[in-house]
Amino acid sequence: MNKFLIIDGLNLVRRIYAAIPDENDMESLTERVSVACTKLLRIHHPTHVAVVWDGDEISWRKQLYPDYKKGRKPMPEPLAAGLIALQEHLQNLQIQSIYAAAEADDVIATLATKTAKAQGEALIVSTDKGFSQLNHPRISQWDHFNQQYLNIAELEQKLGVDRSQFLDLMALAGDSGNKIPGIPGIGPKSAAELLRTFRTLATLFSSLPNLGAKQAKKLAEGRDMARLSYKLVQLQTDLPLNINLRDFRVNSPTKASSNNL
């Protein structure tokens, strides 16, 4: 069975970079990233590996909602300047890259989903909780920095809702880190309480007459913003990838399947 290790490139690299005392020391960054990737291969024994990188195009999310991720600090100049050399170094280690047009998240989600549907196993290396919406028994997530799999029970306890309600929760409460608006006046706690009672957005919005007047008014006025927020948070899982598994085989290119994804 194929096991695809899918590394969220900037999620890994930027956190390693932040721990380096000298921001211009790209040699140390390259060494630490190489060690991290080698460790990932040693621990998880994948048949295939790829690092997925964000692209420079304006994402469809930004076009849909211009405030999306507004205010985020730009990539530090030394890192931006040294990124190509780092990617080339990984290629020399037989760790190939996939370059998204805009955001890597949708490419990662698509690659993981297609791998799972092809009866393979996908392991996403990222600290991004947004990947928890990929609820499939053959898709898992690994936090390299804490050296552990995403604990769904802990995540559900923290969010206050089931994993299957993640998108609905974000639609109501938003996500301040990504500037996802949610519904004004509905915070994470009240959103979780509503979803524990009504289970889904559809049921919630059809039950507004059963709520208090003030809360019902907030929800009614924020319905369109909830729909927008849901769309912004939802990962695309059906992008055309146009890649060949052979190119991402770990250490055994001559034995690779010629399957396309």
Curated annotation (Swiss-Prot):
Its recorded name reads: Flap endonuclease Xni
- Give the family from UniProt: Belongs to the Xni family.
**What is the role of the protein in this entry?**
Has flap endonuclease activity. During DNA replication, flap endonucleases cleave the 5'-overhanging flap structure that is generated by displacement synthesis when DNA polymerase encounters the 5'-end of a downstream Okazaki fragment.
Q: Which Gene3D superfamilies match?
A: 5' to 3' exonuclease, C-terminal subdomain, 5'-nuclease
Cofactor dependence is on: Mg(2+); K(+)
Q: Where is this region: Interaction with DNA?
A: 185-190
Q: Where is the 5'-3' exonuclease domain?
A: 164-256
InterPro entries noted in UniProt:
5-3_exonucl_a-hlix_arch_N (IPR020046), 5-3_exonuclease (IPR002421), 5-3_exonuclease_C_sf (IPR036279), DNA_polI_H3TH (IPR020045), FEN (IPR038969), HhH2 (IPR008918), PIN-like_dom_sf (IPR029060), Xni (IPR022895)
The record's listing under SMART domains reads: 53EXOc, HhH2
Q: Which GO terms describe its molecular function?
A: 5'-3' exonuclease activity; 5'-flap endonuclease activity; DNA binding; magnesium ion binding; potassium ion binding
Report the cofactor remark: Binds 2 Mg(2+) per subunit. Only one magnesium ion has a direct interaction with the protein, the other interactions are indirect. Binds 1 K(+) per subunit. The potassium ion strongly increases the affinity for DNA.
Keywords, comma-separated and alphabetical: DNA-binding, Endonuclease, Hydrolase, Magnesium, Metal-binding, Nuclease, Potassium
Q: Does the keyword DNA-binding apply?
A: yes
List all disulphide bridges recorded for this chain.
none
Which residues does Mg(2+) bind?
A: 105
Q: Name one GO biological process term.
A: DNA replication, Okazaki fragment processing
Task: Cite the NCBIfam families for this sequence.
Answer: PRK09482.1 (NF007017)
Q: Name the enzyme group at the top EC level.
A: hydrolase
So where does K(+) get bound? 172-173, 181, 183, 186
* Record-listed E.C. numbers: 3.1.-.-
